[in-house]
């Protein structure tokens, strides 16, 4: 065995062994318990970043641990390879997206192998290949035939720079999340999948996901947004149109003082024909921000349409306004406004001088009115009231006025100003007013969802073509199965403006049943590919259909899925939805795709910048920052090599924008893959943010060197004898107890608690004890071998290259990749001694170690031999002894 730990020599050798032996390739085996460990597949951007490394290290640690438990472990990897960045990179590099993508895949694959991840590479897939997306296209046509797919013209967020539609979540402060261009509103035809048909099941089944983070489940519940309410129809004066609104607060209906419609609503469009101000407002709204965060914070604007609706219960005229906070694609494109009980409605009414009518009496309002009418009562005798003084009356009038001059938003009051519905609680008013509306034929109880159908059309090139065609007579049909896959041409020229398949009229031409037809030139949202890849991993070479159900049902559901919480309401919702679609198509038999979700925390690093000549921020890599620290290690001053004074902004997420990413490859070349992996798992709990500190990486490297050194010293002494547990001394038994307690703790930390950092800490603590342990005697060496074999196996999931080599040097049986996880010996963990605190007159004077079965007399005798205790007993008489067996001895002296 070489004396020095040299990762650059051992890691490549071990990786070659895994490749040659196909160590991590698996097949279905009904005789073994399966375990499917999956990390979210990467986008092939060109190079791995530390976020990737953290995600995949967590997955690999779990997969290797489960493998050592004897399970049949599947850990696959692939590439989420379609998407807009490839188009931009292709234009920039004067190439096409396909070669750029495939080159990146090849490079990143080598990086993943360099880190020692135990993937089944035989299952590798790339979502941009026809072999993959052909099944997605076929499935889409089947959904169309089921009525779960439709096309409609829809107002969308349009990025004029990228020439594509953006989801609401991709609009940040009114700008494109990717290129920061101002987003416009545009009406275009798009394809949708009816995720709303599954809204109730998606919501209900969250209750069955016991091992998903509550934060993710809450985010999905809120996104689905189930509500119970009433749909109400209003007639419109001087118009044959009707307005339909939905409200979850029919108890406030008698306080509706205006209606608001979207700028694109037919009634607003009709009114605009003779109203230039309204027409101008509608044009302005075409570019309104529609991301929900923006809707909540933007200035509320509106213009009166000139139309009045008729309140169906009072017959009163209610003005109709066009407002920028109402969207056609949400609900009916019209809302009723109750400014007395809604903050947004109140602000709008105040701004435009619209009536405000309160119809729910708050407890405060009720108390103030009661005091003004009856005076103040005694707490002991509430029927005994004293009239208010002049000052008290003024005070209560002020309080009442202040209360009435703001909207009351709660549901704990009672109705008033509501005619025959006065004096009712929320629930009673809800039911009574709903019943009255239903009786009049203008109301219907409904369950609504905030969730909208999934728009899957994208106006870009680098995506899977949508398999639909249009005949010359306008008939729209799914692409016939014998024409699938609709292959995206890869040998294209990118001009940075239009999609090559939109720019080439010949590509769209086809025939269906002998009739000329045009192919759809939109491509799928890339969330389509990432919504079912996990299932295709179970049978990537299967050619008879989308999935081999036998293989899929053996491996699915995924046992643990690892990825960032930023995917909570997009990918993870579509992921669940697609699984239910596949279930209903008879492809899988489970209801949910993954039993457990682990959301890893972000990786943070120091961020520095200097101010340029034009006031701009120039971000400097932390690698290039020369820093000064105070006595507590805090950065107090920094500059770069050019002498620029740097502003330190603290730790922030590694990103290109702040130039604070750390290249994993550089770290692996400097310290070795095992060191990087160990630091990633030790520096922070898996679900918390990780602060990158190279000093911590150096510490992980030093620890591995200590492990290597101890194994080297042990093996240099020759073969160790067999362990004879019965012949161990007390000290040897104590050390063996520590070994097996560590095995028990690490097993629990990795397997149940998934607190990997505490598992590593426990191994480090044990290593410190082993480093101090004697190795002269035969049983010392036998015990050391048992301990080191356990340590190497416990470290194996974290640092597999070093452990592979150390296992061989220790002459462990077979390869460590097939070795079982160490099992704690319960008998070894039994304590035969205990620590007793000794007090004299209630004050701690010492601690003694005694046998667990020691008598009180033996404990007293042992305490008297303790130097610190003995000096307090000199010349005094012990008058009383208080003994708590195995814990405390208190000697009362006088």
UniProtKB/Swiss-Prot annotation:
MF annotations from Gene Ontology: aminoacyl-tRNA deacylase activity; ATP binding; leucine-tRNA ligase activity
Q: What PROSITE patterns does the record point to?
A: AA_TRNA_LIGASE_I
Give EC number(s), comma-separated: 6.1.1.4
Which residues participate in ATP binding?
Answer: 656
Its GO CC terms are: cytosol
Q: Which Pfam families match?
A: Anticodon_1, tRNA-synt_1, tRNA-synt_1_2, tRNA-synt_1g
Highest taxon above the source species: Bacteria
Please provide the record's keywords in A-Z order: Aminoacyl-tRNA synthetase, ATP-binding, Cytoplasm, Ligase, Nucleotide-binding, Protein biosynthesis
**Among its keywords, does the record have Nucleotide-binding?**
yes
Cellular location(s): Cytoplasm
Mitochondrion as UniProt keyword = no
Motif 'KMSKS' region at which residues? 653-657
Entry's Gene Ontology BP terms: leucyl-tRNA aminoacylation
Enzyme class name:
ligase
The reactions it catalyses are: tRNA(Leu) + L-leucine + ATP = L-leucyl-tRNA(Leu) + AMP + diphosphate
Sequence motif 'HIGH' region, location on chain: 42-52
Q: Which InterPro entries match?
A: aa-tRNA-synth_I_CS, aa-tRNA-synth_Ia, Leu-tRNA-ligase, Leu_tRNA-synth_edit, M/V/L/I-tRNA-synth_anticd-bd, Methionyl/Leucyl_tRNA_Synth, Rossmann-like_a/b/a_fold, tRNAsynth_Ia_anticodon-bd
By sequence similarity, the record places it as follows:
Belongs to the class-I aminoacyl-tRNA synthetase family.
Identify this protein by name. Leucine--tRNA ligase
Q: Please report the organism this UniProt entry assigns to the protein.
A: Enterobacter sp. (strain 638)
């Amino acid at each position: 065995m070489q004396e020095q730990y040299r990762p650059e020599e051992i890691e490549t050798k071990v990786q070659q062994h895994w490749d040659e032996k196909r160590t991590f390739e698996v097949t279905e085996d009904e005789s073994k318990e399966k375990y499917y460990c999956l990390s979210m597949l990467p986008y092939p951007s060109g190079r791995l970043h530390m976020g990737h490394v953290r995600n995949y290290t967590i997955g690999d640690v779990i997969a290797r641990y489960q493998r050592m438990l004897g399970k049949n472990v599947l850990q696959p990897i692939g590439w989420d390879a379609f998407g807009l960045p490839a188009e931009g990179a292709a234009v920039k590099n004067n190439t096409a997206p396909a070669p750029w993508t495939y080159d990146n895949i090849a490079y990143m694959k080598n990086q993943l192998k360099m880190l020692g991840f135990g993937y089944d590479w035989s299952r590798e897939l790339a979502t941009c290949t026809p072999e993959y997306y052909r099944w997605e296209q076929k499935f889409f046509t089947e959904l169309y035939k089921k009525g779960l797919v439709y096309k409609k013209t829809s107002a969308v967020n349009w990025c004029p720079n990228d020439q594509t539609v953006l989801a609401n979540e991709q609009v940040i402060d009114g700008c494109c999340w990717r290129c920061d261009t101002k987003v416009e509103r545009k009406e275009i035809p798009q394809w949708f999948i009816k995720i709303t048909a599954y809204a109730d099941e998606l919501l209900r089944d969250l209750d069955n996901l016991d091992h998903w983070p509550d934060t993710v489940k809450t985010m999905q519940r809120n996104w689905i947004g189930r509500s119970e309410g009433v749909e109400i129809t209003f007639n419109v004066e001087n118009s044959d149109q009707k307005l339909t609104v939905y409200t979850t607060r029919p108890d406030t209906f008698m306080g509706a003082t205006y209606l608001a419609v979207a700028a694109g609503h037919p009634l607003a469009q009709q009114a605009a024909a003779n109203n230039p101000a309204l027409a101008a407002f509608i044009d302005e709204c075409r570019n309104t921000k529609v991301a929900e965060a923006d809707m909540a914070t933007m200035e509320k604007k509106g213009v009166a349409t000139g139309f009045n609706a008729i309140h169906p219960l009072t017959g009163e005229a209610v003005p109709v306004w066009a407002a920028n906070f109402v969207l056609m694609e949400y609900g009916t494109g019209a809302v009723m406004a109750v400014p007395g009980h809604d903050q947004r409605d109140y602000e709008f009414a105040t701004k435009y001088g619209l009536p405000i009518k309160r119809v729910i009496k708050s407890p405060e309002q009720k108390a103030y009115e009661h005091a003004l009418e009856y005076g103040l009562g005694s707490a002991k005798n509430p029927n005994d009231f004293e009239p208010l003084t002049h000052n008290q009356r003024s005070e209560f009038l002020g309080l009442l006025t202040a209360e009435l001059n703001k909207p009351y938003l709660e549901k704990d009051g009672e109705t008033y100003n509501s005619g025959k519905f006065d004096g009712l609680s929320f629930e009673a008013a809800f039911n009574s007013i709903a019943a009255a509306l239903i009786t009049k034929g203008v109301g219907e109880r409904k369950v609504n969802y905030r969730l909208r159908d999934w728009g899957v059309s994208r106006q870009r090139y680098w995506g899977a073509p949508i398999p639909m065609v249009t005949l010359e007579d306008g008939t729209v049909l799914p692409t016939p199965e014998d024409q699938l896959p609709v292959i995206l041409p890869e040998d294209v020229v990118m001009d940075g403006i239009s999609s090559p398949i939109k720019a080439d009229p010949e590509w769209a031409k086809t025939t269906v049943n002998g009739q000329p037809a045009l192919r759809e030139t939109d491509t799928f949202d890339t969330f389509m590919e990432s919504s079912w890849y996990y299932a295709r991993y179970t049978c990537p070479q299967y050619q008879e259909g989308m999935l081999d159900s036998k293989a899929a049902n053996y491996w699915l559901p995924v046992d643990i899925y690892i990825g960032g919480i930023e995917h909570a309401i997009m990918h993870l919702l579509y992921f669940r939805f697609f699984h239910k679609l596949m279930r209903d198509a008879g492809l899988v038999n489970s209801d949910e795709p993954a039993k457990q979700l682990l959301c890893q925390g972000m990786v943070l690093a120091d961020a520095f910048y200097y101010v340029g000549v034009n006031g701009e921020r120039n971000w400097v890599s932390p690698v290039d920052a020369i820093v000064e620290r105070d006595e507590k290690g805090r950065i107090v001053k920094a500059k770069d090599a050019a002498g620029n004074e740097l502003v330190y902004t603290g730790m922030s997420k590694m990103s290109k924008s702040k130039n604070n990413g750390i290249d994993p490859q550089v770290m692996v070349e400097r310290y070795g893959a095992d060191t990087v992996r160990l630091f990633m798992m030790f520096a922070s709990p898996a679900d918390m943010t990780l602060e990158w500190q190279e000093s911590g990486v150096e510490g992980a490297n030093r620890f591995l060197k200590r492990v290597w050194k101890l194994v080297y010293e042990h093996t240099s002494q020759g073969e160790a004898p067999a362990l004879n547990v019965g012949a161990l001394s007390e000290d040897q038994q104590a050390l063996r107890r520590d070994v097996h307690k560590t095995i028990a703790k690490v097993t629990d930390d990795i397997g149940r608690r998934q607190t990997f950092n505490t598992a590593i800490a426990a191994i480090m603590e044990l290593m410190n004890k082993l480093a101090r342990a004697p190795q002269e005697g035969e049983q010392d060496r036998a015990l050391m071998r048992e301990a080191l074999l356990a340590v190497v196996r416990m470290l194996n999931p974290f640092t597999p290259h070093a452990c592979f080599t150390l296992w061989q040097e220790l002459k462990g049986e077979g390869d460590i990749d097939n070795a079982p996880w160490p099992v704690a010996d319960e008998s070894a963990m039994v304590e035969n001694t205990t620590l007793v605190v000794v007090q004299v007159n209630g004050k701690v004077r010492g601690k003694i170690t005694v046998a667990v079965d020691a008598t009180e007399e033996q404990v007293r005798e042992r305490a008297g031999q303790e130097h610190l205790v003995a000096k307090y007993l000199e010349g005094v008489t012990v008058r009383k002894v208080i003994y708590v067996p195995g814990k405390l001895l208190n000697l009362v002296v006088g």
